[in-house]
A protein has these predicted regions:
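Iron-associated oxidoreductase/ferritin-like identity signal
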Residues: 1-140
């Protein structure tokens, strides 16, 4: 495993992951309109899942001897629920790419396989959230 490259990739993913936590929380608490109220609770659940994954990234960065970033990817907010979904979809795409990129430096030893497997689970969970957002977007 290229530890320095791994830490760098994980920190980039963490910056985006932290943004995801906050953006889902913002959408959850701010959506208006009857047609969006059903999504508010789901967005809160997504925020909680994003926080759990952010913690896992911090744990892995620390275990590898790195320091977790305190930087946060550019955060956005809009009171327009449809535009908020669009923004989440775009930003989650960026985060998915960063998580995928973090797999590259993992290598083939047991510890690195565990990192790769964890990242794949995060990608799968996040992609399911994006699928939900896309379905919600099409229904609005």
């Amino acid at each position: 495993m290229d530890v320095d490259a791994q830490i760098e990739c994980l920190n980039r993913a963490l910056e985006l992951q932290l943004r995801s936590v906050l953006e889902y929380a913002l959408v959850s608490g701010s959506v208006i309109g009857l047609e969006y109220q059903a999504h508010a609770e789901k967005m809160g659940q997504h925020a909680a899942a994003e926080l759990e994954d952010a913690i896992r990234l911090v744990e892995k960065i620390t275990a590898l001897g790195g320091e977790p970033t305190t930087e946060l990817a550019k955060l956005s907010f809009t009171g327009d629920p449809a535009a908020a979904l669009d923004g989440l979809i775009e930003h989650e795409g960026e985060t998915l790419e960063a998580l995928q990129a973090a797999i590259e430096p993992t290598g083939r030893e047991a510890a690195s396989e565990a990192v790769e497997h964890r990242l794949e689970h995060m990608i799968m969970r996040k992609q399911e959230q994006v699928d939900y957002l896309l379905r919600a977007q099409r229904g609005s």
